[in-house]
């Protein structure tokens, strides 16, 4: 009696991977550019607000504890919801959650510039952190699912560099924007960044 062996179908594995890639733009380097722009947006807002705080205090009569909450509400929401953001990406689709995070982050940024009250700024900074927590885990997951193993380390290195550079560049960019425009501009700058991430 002949014994039949079942060979693993490599095409089925490729087809399983295809839906992830099909939702992303064809070239993986464009995909990396898009998610890196999203990472830059989140990193900038972690550090840029420190430069804007004196102007915020002057314009909105914010106290020192208020200014601390403007910084901390964002960081707390971002850090505490990263795992939730990753699980949501697994359930709903990484690209979808990434785009939701980018768009929500930009809308919250505009709201911060327009709201005109300290409590409103604190609340919207927390909302910024929520949307940042949605997009951040999806960026790395998208990179991992897009690049083949031989290019993955390079891609992750670029992704990590984008995060580090954005945090370091925040005070520099914030100083330029606050000096030449207004404190609101450090949040409005997220809108063109978000547009670039969505278009790519």
Where are the regions a protein language model picked out?
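Transmembrane-helix bundle of Major Facilitator Superfamily
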Residues: 2-200
């Amino acid at each position: 009696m002949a014994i039949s062996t079942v060979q693993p179908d490599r095409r089925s594995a490729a087809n399983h991977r295809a839906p992830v890639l099909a939702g992303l733009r064809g070239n993986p380097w464009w995909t990396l550019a898009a998610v890196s722009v999203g990472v830059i947006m989140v990193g900038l807002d972690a550090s840029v607000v420190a430069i804007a705080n004196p102007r915020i205090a002057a314009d909105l009569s914010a106290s020192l504890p208020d200014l601390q909450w403007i910084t901390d509400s964002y960081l707390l929401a971002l850090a505490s919801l990263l795992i939730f953001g990753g699980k949501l990406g697994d359930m709903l689709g990484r690209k979808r959650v990434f785009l939701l995070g980018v768009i929500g982050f930009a809308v919250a940024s505009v709201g911060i510039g327009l709201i005109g009250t300290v409590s409103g700024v604190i609340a919207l900074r927390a909302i910024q952190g929520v949307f940042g927590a949605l997009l951040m885990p999806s960026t790395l997951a998208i990179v991992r699912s897009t690049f083949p193993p031989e290019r993955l380390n390079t891609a992750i290195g670029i992704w990590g560099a984008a995060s580090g550079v954005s945090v370091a560049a925040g005070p520099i960019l914030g100083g330029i924007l606050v000096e030449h425009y207004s404190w609101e501009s450090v949040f409005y700058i997220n809108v063109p960044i978000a547009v670039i991430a969505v278009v790519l």
